[in-house]
Structures are given as C-alpha cells and as structure tokens.
A protein has these predicted regions:
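Solvent-exposed soluble domains appended to multi-pass membrane proteins
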Residues: 151-487
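A sequence-composition feature that detects small, non-aromatic residues
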Residues: 16, 28-30, 68, 74, ...
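Basic, amphipathic N-terminal segments that precede the first structured/catalytic domain
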Residues: 118-139, 289-300, 304, 308
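A diffuse structural propensity rather than consistent per-protein peaks
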Residues: 44-57, 136-140, 211, 243, ...
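Transmembrane and membrane-interface helices of multi-pass
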Residues: 1-136
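Short extracytoplasmic/periplasmic juxtamembrane "stem" segments immediately C-terminal to an N-terminal membrane anchor
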Residues: 61-64, 136-152
Length: 487
C-alpha cells in the first residue's frame, strides 16, 4: 500500500499546475508538506522500531520518550528537525516553480484531488489510525469467548523448594550477545555460568517490547493495552488478575525491587504497588543513600548493584524469604552507558552499545559471583532474564536483529548439577510461571506455563489472541473462567 500511496502522490505533483489559482496551489503545497512529513516519520519508525505508526508507537512515545532524558535522543531530534526543514524547503520550491505556470483544466485538477486523496488514504499513517478505535472499543464478549479457553486461573500451593529469589532483568539484552560465534568474547561471565537451567528458545510476546510491559508480561503471564490517563493509575488496576509477585507474597515472601532509573518513569511505582511490592528503590531513593555516579537515565549499574548486594545481605539476615527484583540500565537504547568500574575493561569492540553489553556482563557476573560465594548461596536461586530485546540502536555494528534474537532466561541454583539446557518453545509469559513451577507452587498462571512440566501456549508470539486478551484485561473475570470450565 505504501508504494501505491507514493505513486499517487507523485502523480498528483505533476497535476498540481492545473489548479489555476495560487491559493489552491498554496493549500496543495501545505497538504504535500503534511503527506511527506507523515511518510518520512513512518519510514523512520519502520527503520528504528520495525513498526508503522500506530497504537504501539503512540504508547512507546508516551511512556518511553516523554519524561526521558532529551540528550539520549539528541541525534534523532536533530535529524528530525533537518528533515522537517528539508520538507518545508521542498514545498516552498514546489510552489515557486509551479505558480508562474498555472493553467486552467478542471478535469486534470479533479484528477489531482483524486490522486492526492488516494495517496492519503493509502498512507500507512491513515491505515493504522483505525487501530485506535478498535482498541478503545473492543467487543468484550467476543474476545472473552476467544481467550477464556486458554487463560488459566492460578491456584497456588505451598512451595516444595523455599529459597530466596534474586530476579535480575537485563535491560534490552539480546540472547545473541551470549553467542560466541556472533560476538566472540563479548560476554565471558554470563555465557559461562554453571549450575543452571538454560531456556534457549524463549521469544518475546507481542506488545511487551518496552520495559514496563516486559515486566508486566513476565510477572503476570499476560499483557495489557495502555489506556492513557485512565486504568493504569487506578489503585485497583489489574487487581482482577493475580500475578507471580502476589503469589509469592501469599507464600510469605517479602517483595523488593530496585532499578537505577526513576520509579516515576513509565509509572513503575504504580506497577510495583499493584504487584504488592513492599520495598522499592529507584534513582531518587538511591541518591538519598549517598553520592552515586549517574548517566542520562539514572544511577549507573555498578553503584546500583553495590546497594543491591548490601540489601541482599540485609534481607538474607532479616527475612525468612524474599524476592529481590533488579533491573539494570547500562544497555538502554540507543547507545548504552558505561559504568565507571568498566572503563578499563579490555573491550572487544569500540561500539558504544557493545561496550555497554560487555560492561553489564562483567558487573552482573561479579554480582552473581558474590552471591554464590556467600554464606547465603545455598538458600538462594538467581533468575536471569532480559526485560525485552534491544528495540533499536544507533550502532551500525550491532548486527543482531531484535525480531530474530531469542530471550535470555536462566534459573541458577547450587542444587542444579552442571547445565541443563531446555530448547522447548516458550515465551516471555512463561518465565515467572516457570520459576513458580520450579519452586513447586503452580504450573499455570494466565497465559504463562511452567516449561519444566507443560508446553507453552500453542500460538506464535505475535498471535492476535494475546492482543485480544490485552484489550480486555480489566474485564477478565476468574469467576467467569472457572464457571465456563465447570459447565
């Protein structure tokens, strides 16, 4: 459709001289500006995010651009500004070239209008605009009928293994980084961890491609459609479903979360409250503990992990059981950030993002070593997972395609002998459910499945069933699901 749109637009340019009045030509040039701007903007989105303009992009801008440090996107803003100036100049030149040669021909003027309208109607921006209406007005009953057979009400039982959990989410970390054939010597620590179960065929579910949605999808085994200024800030948002953290809390676990960025960004604080976390730390809280080194997004990973270590020791001594959830920041798109501790590492690449990847490998690897060498190791399992693959990068040397890269998901436990590799198909919805399954608590949670015992959902990771469920998330009723099963 894009090719048809561009063809019709080019034809309309040749027909513009038949508008015969300068004010009509002025209106036409203004419409040309709008069309070209839409087309260029959509093309940029396609290059960087792999998606046309639509609801996903609006949500991404709303949650991941607004409130983000401007310096991080300085290059993109400069390019966009230059593009806008270039389009304006093109339209001015177009007007100046055509206006002296206007001629009167109503038939050809009509064709100009026709081709320009077709160009707009076949523009990807217009085509995807209808998605907004469908999202805000879902056929709830129809979507329930489609999704309920696959949604599983979580029924927990006392854990067979009652250990503390350190759950580490690696920001924008592709599994391909661990592949020595693709990136030799890039991740010597994380690639060589032992006493683990390594799940090698995990894909990211559609519409969980940025941090908050990645965390939600992992915790809850389901995703949600972002509703602006509405449900997500409600204290009761998503309380109609149960997620992994709440289930652990019911089992007596103390819930702790920390990341280097501000907890207000992407409404992380509200998410944690909804998920019943007891203790939360972000940039503001970390800076209150003393001076820290900062990057554009927040506290650097070396300082954050130092605080995390001290808190791990404190929690191990004070709490019977706890979940310590950590989110790194060094590999945040588009270029990553280098912690001061990593400045003298023997980097295998001078690329900014790959240096950040290697730094994260070093810092997280050392953090894991400290836990495993401590007196608390036997009573602790460590989970490694990326929140989502790298969405985009300014780097020309990062050859990993986020669409094709698998997710990282590992369970580390001293009780595991060697390395157990599981190549069973799974999704990011299955990770937290599998951790609960490893502990013996449950095997099914919403769309999540315990990959140690049962198969994942029989759908591709971008199947519409996930999107339909996300659009009616706040309407899902466990009572309705169980009543359907009983009947």
């Amino acid at each position: 459709m894009t090719y048809i749109s561009v063809f019709c637009f080019i034809v309309s340019l040749f027909l513009a001289k038949f508008l015969h009045k300068k004010w009509l030509l002025g209106v036409a040039c203004a419409l040309c500006f709008v069309y070209i701007l839409f087309l260029v903007f959509d093309t940029i989105l396609l290059i960087y995010l792999g998606k046309h303009f639509g609801f996903y992009v609006v949500v991404f801008i709303k949650t991941s651009i607004i409130g983000a440090p401007i310096s991080t996107f300085a290059r993109e803003l400069i390019i966009l500004s230059c593009v806008v100036i270039g389009i304006v100049l093109f339209c001015v030149i177009l007007y100046q070239k055509i206006s002296p040669n206007l001629s009167k021909n109503f038939k050809l003027a009509f064709l100009f209008i026709l081709f320009l309208i077709i160009a707009f109607l076949t523009n990807p921006l217009y085509i995807n605009a209808k998605e907004f209406y469908e999202i805000y007005n879902p056929p709830v009953a129809k979507f329930k009928k489609i999704t309920y057979p696959y949604l599983k009400v979580p029924h927990s039982k006392a854990p067979k293994i009652r250990k503390n959990i350190v759950y580490i989410y690696l920001e924008s970390y592709n599994r391909d980084y661990l592949n020595s054939q693709v990136f030799p010597n890039l991740t010597p620590y994380l690639s060589n961890l032992d006493n683990k179960i390594d799940f090698t065929n995990i894909t990211q579910v559609v519409d969980t491609e940025f941090t908050l949605k990645g965390l939600f999808g992992s915790h809850c085994g389901i995703n949600y459609t972002y509703v602006f200024g509405k449900d997500k800030t409600d204290k009761n948002f998503s309380e109609n479903i149960k997620c992994g953290s709440e289930i652990l809390k019911e089992q007596g676990y103390y819930l702790y979360f920390m990341k280097g960025a501000d907890l207000e960004f992407q409404d992380t604080r509200n998410f944690l409250k909804h998920r019943k976390y007891d203790e939360m730390k972000g940039k503001t809280e970390l800076l209150q503990d003393g001076e820290k080194s900062l990057n554009a997004w927040g506290v650097n990973d070396d300082d954050m992990l130092e605080v995390a270590w001290n808190d791990f020791v404190r929690l191990s001594k004070e709490k019977d059981n706890f979940l310590q959830t950590l989110l790194t920041i060094s590999t945040h798109a588009p270029d990553g950030f280098l912690s001061k501790t990593c400045e003298n590492l023997p980097f295998v690449s001078q690329d900014g993002m790959l240096r950040a990847v290697q730094c994260t490998d070093y810092l997280v690897g050392k953090f894991i070593d400290k836990i495993r060498l401590s007196e608390f190791s036997k009573n602790t399992i460590i989970i490694l997972q990326n929140d989502h693959p790298l969405p985009y990068s300014n780097s020309g040397s990062v050859e990993t395609n986020p669409k094709n890269s698998k997710n990282i998901f590992m369970i580390l436990d001293d009780s595991i002998n060697g390395t157990i590799t599981i190549d069973k198909k799974g999704t990011s919805f299955d990770s937290f459910t599998t951790v609960l399954g490893y502990l013996g608590i449950l095997d099914e949670m919403n769309f999540g499945r315990n990959l140690l015992k049962v198969d994942s959902m029989p759908f591709e990771n971008n199947d519409e069933i996930y999107q339909k469920a996300s659009r009616i998330l706040t309407e899902i009723s466990y009572d309705e699901i169980e009543n359907k099963i009983s009947h």
